[in-house]
Structure formats: C-alpha cells, structure tokens
Amino acid sequence: MTDSQASADLESHLASELRRVIDEAAVRDLASRYCWAIDRLDRAAFDTVFLPDATAVLGQGEERGIEEIWAKVDLVLSPLTCSQHLVGSHVVEVDGDTATHRCQFHAQHVMKGCEGGDQYIVAGTYEDRVERTAAGWRIRHRDLTVLWTSGNPLVARR
C-alpha cells in the first residue's frame, strides 16, 4: 500500500467515524429535546422530535400519529403544576438512515395540593426506532416501559 492509499483509507475511516459520532449525538439529542418539549408543553418543539405518522406506547395502548401522541402527553402533563423528565444511559445504534435508541428516564410530576401528596416519580426506559429525514433525525416509534414508581399516583392519573 502506498502512502497516498494509506492516507486516503485513513481519511475515509475518519470521515465515517465522524459521521457515526454526529449521528449518534443527534439521536441522543432527540431524547433531551423530547423532555424539554413535554415539560414546557411546547407543541412546536414536540413536532421536531416525532415523525408525523409516528407511533408510541406510553402506557396502555398505542398512540398513532403525532396528534394522538401529543394528546396523550397533554392529557397527563397539562394539569400538573410542573414536571421534569431526565434521560441518561443512552445506547444508539445507527444503520444508514435508521437507528435504534434506548435510554433510561426519571420523571418527576408535581401537582400542588393533590390529596395524598403532591409528587409522583416514574422511572423506566424509552426504546425508540428513529429515522433520518431532510429536517434531521425523528422518532418513528417509541416504547415507554415503567420500571418503578414512587409517591402519589393520583398526581398523574388522567
């Protein structure tokens, strides 16, 4: 192998690795943007996270389309005094223009004056199928799995 071939191979490898790192960061960013959007009840921001025809299992049943997904989020979170969703332990696997993503979440829900206590914590995992679009990465499907809860479940019963 000549020096120019080795240099070209290295350049190609570095470009591929850079693309992978950028893609993985963009997919991880979706989870954070989702948290910010739902905690602020920011529909415009929410629309930059999911595909219009996305699906999601956020509890019982499957929500079909971004309108149903938003309606479910709004139903649960809009009555609250506040909520704070945190994500971590991300694992991203990119395959061309599709990816899988999983992470853990910790969600604090607060409703001041709720009988039985004003806080409810839900912790679990998000597992996503994600697609690259002209506008960037978007979630095609999300599965939410609850691993544990603490506090007053009446806070988030809607």
Q: For the regions a protein language model found, what residue spans apply to each?
A:
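Short beta-strand edge/turn micro-motifs at domain boundaries
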Residues: T2-Q5, T100, A123-P153
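C-terminal-biased regions
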Residues: D9, H13, Q84-S89, Q108, ...
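A solvent-exposed, acidic/Ser-Thr-rich amphipathic alpha-helical stretch
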Residues: R43-A107
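Transmembrane beta-barrel outer-membrane domains
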Residues: A25, L80-S83, Q119-I121
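Short, low-complexity N-terminal intrinsically disordered segments enriched in polar/charged residues
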Residues: M1-W36, R40, T48
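Short, surface-exposed loop/helix-turn segments at secondary-structure junctions
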Residues: G113-Y120, V155-R157
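Beta-strand elements of well-folded, non-transmembrane domains
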Residues: A107-M111, V130
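Short, surface-exposed coil-to-beta transition loops
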Residues: H85-V87, I121-Y126
